[in-house]
Amino acid sequence: MSLLGVDIGITGVKAVAFDETGRQLASAYEEYSLLFPSPGARELDPRKVIEAACRVIQSAASQTNDPVTAIGIASQGEAFTPVMPDGRMIGNTMIFSDARAEPYVRPWSESFGAERAYRITGHIPYTMYSLFKFLWLKEHQPDVWASAWKFLFFEDLLAWVLTGETKTDYTMAARTMMFDVTKKSWSPEIMETVGLTPDRLPEVIPSGGIVGTVKREMASKLGLTPDATVSVCGHDQPVGALGCGAAIPGKASYSIGTVECVCAAVDRLIMSPELMAANLVIYPHVVPDTYTTQGFNATGGSVLKWVRDNFATQEASEAHARGEDPYERIIAAASSEPADVILLPHFGPTGTPHLDPRGAGVLFGLKLSTSRAEVLRAFLEGITYEMKWNLSILGDAGIQLDELRAVGGGSRSETWMQIKADILGIPLTTMKVTEATCMGAAILAGNRASESWAEPIRTFEPRKEYASMYEDRFAIYKEIYTSLSKAREMLSEL
């Protein structure tokens, strides 16, 4: 028997089959395109997403001799799709970064109360959450709002197509900002402000809970056994944390990709003033009796992509010609010592702790003597200072981390991992698993959450000789951000 983990992302979907010991048997991946129909709009065509998901399931299942007995689905959060009972999907799906709902955030917060909302949901009002996208949909597409039978999130949308049942899990429900994280149920008082009733949303079950078995016609189409179970496993970040063995208090996953995210596990529901002030969420983890809080940098790896395309074209061209990774060449070209130039990596709306839609990148401290190598080093460090800010706030709230487990494309660079460990002051372990979210989903689908399939590769210890140097630079980093508040506002109005 084999277990299949599915990860429905923003730009593509993966399916990976594992045996019962965590050995990878097969995998498949397919991309799809983001849509930008109007200013601020970012959508996916849900029909194409689900079609792609079905194809990768079929492909992965066909590559293994062991029949797939359980499918676990994880996905991006916040995005919902209006559906009809006959299986039709209405319109497109607004993803987390769709900004059209921003005008609804402040009026709703002032009316309901931001702290009151946080005490119920563990989330601070912000445009990414489903609640505000529902308000936008209700006003701007009233026909879709009125005619929709249910609104499903990507994990439960795929599960519905496979089984005919509509269920989601605690973590996905939490990302709507309409879920009571204490009672672990939809919040009637918040849903009332939107004009929604629970019957128009999926039933909520624990992460990894079984939705049903694959419908006979779908099993035949995808090459699955009719008795294969389908589980909704959760929001991709905590599922990925489980996959890399970091769903344990004191540990956190560190996803280093287009977006950087630290997903920490805690053993109790902490709703502290420090977390609230820093926009740091708290909601159930995918592991029972555990909660998660997350800090993220919305423009992490995407800033390095900007460097590649605009500032390091020679390295990128040489790497392409030789079939090498351009980012490794960029990192190798950076200075070997801490830079005296400080980068604020806000090349778009920021992540936590600021959640500032007026984000603006800053390169501070340039001199005639500044070298290109030092500027490249500043980019590597600035992205990491942003995550250090998040981790320092977690520490102030009593959440102490003794290890970060790094996954994602950025974790392949040993040089960058050592820089990050030095700046963060926490041991950083790289992992053998390349598809942590798919592995986490497979673990949950197989009811093996108490096990760890994760294999560490190397731990990078912080070097003491760099500690004070980076603390001094981090203090400057924070001062730059704070001092430029008025300038960011003025720039956004140009």
Across the structure, where does each feature detected by a protein language model lie?
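Active-site nucleophile and cofactor-binding loops and adjacent substrate-binding regions
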Residues: G22, L44, A70-S75, M94-S97, ...
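Gly/Ser/Thr-rich active-site cleft segment
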Residues: S2, I8-I10, A117-H235, L304, ...
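A polyampholytic, Gly/Pro-enriched intrinsically disordered region
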Residues: V49, E110-Y126, G223-T225, G250-Y254, ...
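Conserved beta-strand and immediately adjacent loop positions that scaffold enzyme active sites
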Residues: K14, A79, R175, A252, ...
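Glycine/Thr-rich phosphate-binding loops that ligate phosphate moieties of nucleotide
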Residues: M1-Y29, F36, T69, I73-S111, ...
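ATP-dependent carbohydrate kinase catalytic cores
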Residues: D180-P288, A298-T299, E315-R329, S411, ...
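Phosphate/pyrophosphate-binding loops at sites that engage ATP/ADP/AMP, CoA/4′-phosphopantetheine
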Residues: A53-T69, H140-W145, P188-P198, S220, ...
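N-terminal phosphate-binding loop and adjacent alpha-helix
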Residues: A28-P67
